[in-house]
């Protein structure tokens, strides 16, 4: 019997290799991942997939930043409480201050420490228990 699929996650990063690597890791843990190379694509995916339960976004991207995405989410009534995790290779104190104000769940420095990320996700979304009926 296949394991039930866990929550839908949206991964936003202009580095598509990073998105694919993270998606592979998280799908191996049972999550369903959508990837977006930009804020524009991320917003489109959020509209198309209302069951997305969490966003993991890079902080710095060429067209629009992760902070811009989070601000848009917080202004959108149906998505204002959507949990967001931010990743960054170089966040400064001003970024951290903005992220705290925007009620970000966590900030991970790149390269992402996968064990800690999985702990965070498993605490937020406990793995479904699969019960096997005995004979």
What are the roles of these predicted feature ranges?
Residues 112-121:
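C-terminal output helix
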Residues 19, 61-63, 92:
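The feature encodes the CheY-like receiver
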Residues 37-41, 65-68:
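Acidic catalytic/metal-coordinating carboxylates
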Residues 50-56:
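Active-site beta3 strand of CheY-like receiver
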Residues 20-28:
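Charged docking surfaces used in two-component/phosphorelay signaling
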């Amino acid at each position: 019997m296949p394991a039930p699929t866990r929550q839908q996650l949206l991964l936003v990063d202009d580095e598509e290799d990073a998105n694919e690597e993270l998606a592979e890791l998280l799908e191996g843990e049972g999550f369903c991942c959508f990837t977006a190379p930009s804020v524009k694509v991320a917003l489109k995916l959020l509209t198309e997939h209302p069951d997305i339960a969490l966003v993991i976004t890079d902080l710095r991207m060429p067209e629009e930043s992760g902070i811009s995405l989070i601000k848009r989410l917080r202004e959108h009534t149906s998505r204002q409480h959507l949990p967001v995790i931010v990743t960054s290779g170089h966040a400064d104190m001003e970024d951290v201050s903005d992220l705290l104000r925007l009620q970000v769940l966590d900030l991970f420095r790149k390269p992402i420490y996968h064990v800690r990320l999985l702990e965070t996700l498993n605490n937020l979304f406990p793995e479904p228990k699969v019960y096997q009926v005995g004979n």
